Every structure is written in structure tokens, then in C-alpha cells.
Amino acid sequence: MLGVLSVFGAPSALSAEDDERIALRAFLESHIEASDSFEDRYAAEVWLVDMSARLEPFVADADDRLELLRQIHAAASRSELTPELVLAVIEVESAFDRFAVSRAGAQGLMQVMPFWREEIGRPGDNLTVNTTNLEYGCRILQYYLAREDGALHRALAGYNGSSGSRIYSDKVKRAWTRRWKGAPLDWTR
């Protein structure tokens, strides 16, 4: 608690932005863990073969593609997200470049801001490691989807830090529609 107070000041001085940051930090701390993601081997093979062909323009090596797809599927599944939505977010955020760094300093596939490592007490995490970046990014997106009651446009705007604008979410929707479309998603909100 003292760490929170030293970063944000006295509890009465917390702004709505600080409250949200604290809530997201608690959510991340409680949800970063590992589990298996495919129902069975057949489902895994069908999905991996299909998505591997779609990912080939971004990742040339077949083994690298399959490993990345397994990692994406696992992180998305743990976060109760469709892997195809995560693929669309990654295409827009980094074009699948795990070493991508934004002008604001966001890093990796899902362009996670480095301050989250300190916020959740994991300062040694490397955001250019795919599994780490995917876990952070998927959990952050999961948080915003829950906060926005499943409204994709608003959740994606929150993820991107562009609340109130549909520019980013429309880019993700275009990527999803053009390349990653899988299970139906409600893009009406």
C-alpha cells in the first residue's frame, strides 16, 4: 500500500485515471499465469494450419509462425479473447515485429508500455519476449473489454489510449475482416 501511496499520493487525492491504473494493475497481477489452450489435437492442427497461411506474409519461417501462433492462442485463451482478435491487434500494433518500439515507448508485439512491469511488481520482465508481451497485452485487452461490457470499439480505444475515438478500433476491425476473421465478433458497439 505504501508503494501505491508513494506513486499516487494520498488516497483522497487519487484521480479517476489513477483509480483505473490501480484497478488494471490488480487485474494484471491476479491473472498472469499459464495453461493449455486447445480443446484437442485436431482443433489445434486445423487452427494452426489455417492461421499459419494467413500469418506467412509477416513471418516467413514456418516453425517460427507455428510457435508464435501457439503462444498467441494460449495467451488469448487464458484471457478469454478470440485469438483472431489478438492477431488483428498485433498486425496493427507491430506488424508482428517483437522488437517494435512506438514513439511513446510501447514495446513488442502488442505494444505494451514498460511502466506496467513496475506497476505489477515484475520489473525484470522483458516485453520483447513474445510470451511475456502477449500475456500483458491480452490481459490488458481483457480488462478493457470487461470494463466496457464487451463493447469492442470502446475496449480497443481504451487499450490504445485513444478513448472516444474509433480510428484505432476501425484499423483493428479492418485487419480482422481482411485477414483474421474467425468466430463472429460484435463490432456494433
Name each model-derived stretch:
Residues 1-9:
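Bacterial N-terminal signal peptides
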Residues 9, 13-16:
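Boundary at the C-terminal end of the N-terminal hydrophobic targeting segment
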Residues 22-23, 31-189:
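Catalytic glycan-binding domains that act on GlcNAc-containing polysaccharides
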